[in-house]
Amino acid sequence: MVRVRPLWPLAAVTALIAVPLLPLAATSQTPKYGGVLVTSPLSAAPSLSPHEESTVAVVQQASPCFNNLVYYDPAKKQESVDTIIPELAEKWSWQDGNRNLVFLLRRDVKWHDGKPFTSADVKYTFDMVRAAPDAKGRLKVNPRKLWYENIEAIEAPDPYTVVFRLKKPQPALLPMLASGYSPIYPAHVPLAEFKNKCIGTGPFKLKENKPGEYVEYVKNPDYFVKGRPYLD
């Protein structure tokens, strides 16, 4: 289980600064299943919808629920695109003079409600974020629309292939897709539900959200990374 509780006192700041040192001492130990993790960001997130927020708090509090197409390898320093690895994507390639970014997706991923993850979800998410004319969802607040203004079109030729067609080459697109603000949303879930709820593909499922108090997650038994997560 994971519980995220906002903390305000100065003592909380000190505790948070000390936290990154703990895993270093534990790296030689064999991971064990079970247990509870309590984390304490310095503020409460306004919602559990990263695409509609700009605070670090929303990433901290919503990230257990979600996955990206790609992400930065947590075992390496985030120094270049060479540290970006697949997550919901199995692999990717640049084509047509780096104007097309093609992703091949994992086939073993389910949303927390049991529905399969497909390319339609990726297209839905980024058509919505870039405010495409034919987008099936609209964000009330869209702080990162400019990130994706170079996208000409997003195509889903089959359930496990996604093509980002660009107006011109954009090497920075991959790092933006690896950002904590770039999770994939389910196309079948109304966007309004993400105000206080969360249906993702991540290692933890939302159990309870008390805005301003805590967000509690439990282990996702169907998580696509076998044997993970370790926490209950």
Report residues per predicted region.
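Surface-exposed binding/hinge segments that line
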Residues: 32, 104, 123, 142-186
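Short, well-ordered beta-strand elements
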Residues: 33-44, 90, 100-102, 122-125, ...
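Solvent-exposed coil/turn segments that connect beta secondary-structure elements
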Residues: 42-45, 53, 74-75, 97-99, ...
